[in-house]
Amino acid sequence: MTTEAAKEESVEWTLAGLLELFDVEPAGDDVFVGQTGYAGHDERQVVEGTQVLAQAIVAVAKRFPGKSVRSAYAVFARAVVVGPPVELALDVVAEGRSTATAIVNVTQGGKRCITLTVFTDVPSDDVIRHQLARPDVVAPAEANHAHMPMVGRQLRLVDVVDVNSPDEVGPPELHAWLHYDPIPERVELAKALVAYFTGHLGISTTMRAHEGIGTAQAHLTVSTAPMTISVSFHEPFAWSGWLLYTHESTQVGAGMSYVRGAVHSEEGELIASFGQDALIRPLRTSDTSIKAESRL
């Protein structure tokens, strides 16, 4: 075994390591470079699209200091693979005193993979204010522990034991408690971290309503992939303790599903809202399988 292969095999994902990946470095005028990490134990060679979404949020925050990232919309046109870095090129659409917008083109190896639109502004005083109430679900201590191999992160599911199982049948909704330790002090990294999980359970949410199908079959008998994700951050953006991710699948058909979601603090503050379009289609003969533990 080569030294590099041994290094990859021994990699243990940590929250600190994930935040390092999010913290992209400048590489020229309006250009940033981000690392993709290692495949790790699950042998997954495809980078999570939300990892690059998180990197784009950080890049735009660095480009527009003094402004707050309020929303981001990503289209995942081509997979990013583990290994080579990605380049994030910012096209500044407009930059004013109170708002700024950039289109982020993400390339790897000279090929465009992801396009994002990110909006920022300077938060103002309230004219009016209301929010969606946090769902009345069991507390984290009463929820089911879920295996998620990352040091510094805990996941607990409400009313679901194995989110991948085709035997987990219920309404097309999922509630997940998530805990990070430590919570990033830099707000752009905190927003990137919240955005990162928005793509993890959407497909499972949709499949839950249909008997005999689950994400354990993803890339074995069905082809699945998030294709777009949108996330909006609500000010003031801050939390301590646990986060509750609520997912609701409002439609699936013709090979695509749509999920909308919300992120509440344990105290009940709505800090983010998100949406996901995902592909759910019969497996093509050209598709390849991945290990079950990487499908969460």
Language-model features and meaning:
Residues M1-L296:
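Terminal targeting signals and extreme-terminal segments of soluble enzymes
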